Amino acid sequence: MMDQDPQTTANNIIQLANSTPFGVGGRRACYVHPVDASKCIKVLRQDERRTVRIQKKGNLFPKSWRREYDNNAHEEKLLSRIHSKIGSRMASHLPMCYGFVSTDLGRGLVLDLIRDHDGKISRSLREWITLGIDLESIKPAFMNLGNFLIEHSILTRHILDHNLALSLGKSGSRTFYLIDGIGDAAWLPLAQWFPPLGRIKIKRKLDAAWPRFKAFATSGGVTGQLKEKSSWGQGILQHRG
């Protein structure tokens, strides 16, 4: 896939442990790929403060028998499915997926890393809200994302501010990328089977998201106290390198 630099790998295992992740979610940490800065590597967190989510297998099996949910495997499957459906068009609002690599922190998923025109890692909407952005100024960009999701029947879970990266273009353009949260959590995936139902569901998610963003902005965004008590990064970048 990508040439590996012997200075950053050992026995074809990419070294990440001594690097600082630019983003930390409840279950995963995101690192700049040490060989290709246009890509990132997502690895599952192993620390005790991570959010644990157990795979749903119904009530036939005790919870202790079920495996911990693998976000990476799920995301790779969904992004590959979208790519087989619409090809490179997905790159207008979604990261392209490049499969798995071995790292010293476990198996990692390689994806496009969304950056601004100046090369810095793009901030999440959650971080922009915390910085006091005027939401109305970016609503057209959000509408463009919504139209894309509806047009291609790309289902999402709740559309959350920390799962949206806002890329700033050279001419002042702004583009939203959905960097997490794709898929349908429904036990019976009717919205996947019937595109008209899927489009209705997507629109409902979009309609619910914007008022939630406005309410969060009114509350002042991520406070120092919230971030201090949190087991994840609250959508705030640790660096933009």
Language model features by range: what are they?
Residues 1-20:
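Juxta-kinase regulatory segment immediately upstream of eukaryotic protein kinase catalytic domains
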Residues 21, 26-81:
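ATP-binding glycine-rich loop module of kinase domains
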Residues 32-33, 99, 113, 166-168:
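Conserved hydrophobic "DFG−1" position in protein kinase catalytic cores
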Residues 36, 106-107, 174:
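Conserved catalytic motifs of the protein kinase core domain
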Residues 40-46, 112-114, 180-182:
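Active-site ExK catalytic segment of metal-dependent nucleases
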Residues 59-62, 129-142, 147-158, 166-241:
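C-lobe/activation-segment region of protein kinase-like
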Residues 78-92:
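Structural motif at the C-terminus of the N-lobe alphaC helix and the adjacent alphaC-beta4 loop
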Residues 89-138:
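Conserved structural core of kinase catalytic domains
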